[in-house]
């Protein structure tokens, strides 16, 4: 199993980790864009090393399972609806740039912008689908292009379909970003360990170390958990 972010990774999160913002269209709660696949890997490595997490890009199979609504799927053409305007920012909206994340209706799993807004990098190299049934395929071992899913603000409704896929080399485009995933086995193991020791306190701090008594939505904090065995864990979270 796996976990996947409800939102596309925002410029706020990217800048908090990397210290700079590569996006062509600035906006804290807009998805980070103009990032290549390789740049995303650098971000994920720094995020994991800094905050002791295990994030990664979703595989293409995981991404499609999620965009279709997972085990709650109702078989929609787009992610969460048969009416594209309900769930996707796309070319008919006559937009000049991507929109802040979470502005449309989520899909059956509560995931936003799986159709439209920006294309999303997945982990896989691009390759033709196998003609044989497969369970959680991982794509080719090597290639020249990586897969993009989801469509973008520049594309027609055809690109918003849950089955639509394309690919490009690892280059930067202002219509391409990503969302984070995490393997459930790792997350479950951590949760199991955490539950075996009594938690004494949970506090949120801003990135410059100031205690946040009333955390605000869509802001980044360091979550500090202190337990009775004296251990302290710190993780970056978007509240």
Tell where the protein language model's regions lie, with residue ranges.
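A short glycine-rich, aromatic-capped structural motif
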Residues: 1-22, 115-116
